[in-house]
């Protein structure tokens, strides 16, 4: 179990998991608020 914790706390695993989280968050924001970038100019 300690080896699994050590593996999950390494930098590539943390980076990939954070990128997946951010990508999912952006997808969900764009699903509920489509074309939100065009509203920034008004």
From Swiss-Prot:
- Location in the cell: Plastid, Chloroplast thylakoid membrane
User: What processes does the entry annotate via GO biological process terms?
Assistant: photosynthesis
Question: Which InterPro entries does the protein's record reference?
Answer: PSI_PsaJ (IPR002615), PSI_PsaJ_sf (IPR036062)
Primary site of residence: plastid
State the UniProt keywords alphabetically: Chloroplast, Membrane, Photosynthesis, Photosystem I, Plastid, Thylakoid, Transmembrane, Transmembrane helix
Query: Which chain regions cross the lipid bilayer?
Result: 7-27
Determine if Metal-binding is one of this entry's keywords: no
Q: Does the keyword Membrane apply?
A: yes
What is one term from the GO cellular component aspect held by the record? chloroplast thylakoid membrane
- Which SUPFAM superfamilies has this protein been placed in? Subunit IX of photosystem I reaction centre, PsaJ
The source's superkingdom equals Eukaryota
The way it spans or sits in the membrane comes to: Single-pass membrane protein
Gene3D superfamilies (UniProt xref): Single helix bin (1.20.5.510)
HAMAP family the record matches:
PSI_PsaJ
Name the protein family.
Belongs to the PsaJ family.
Tell me, what does this protein do in biology? May help in the organization of the PsaE and PsaF subunits.
Q: What is this protein called?
A: Photosystem I reaction center subunit IX
Q: Which organism is it from?
A: Picea glauca
Identify the gene encoding this protein. Answer: psaJ
């Amino acid at each position: 179990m300690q080896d699994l914790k050590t593996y999950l706390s390494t930098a590539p695993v943390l980076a990939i998991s954070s990128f997946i989280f951010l990508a999912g968050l952006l997808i969900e924001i764009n699903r509920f608020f489509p074309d939100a970038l065009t509203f920034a100019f008004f």
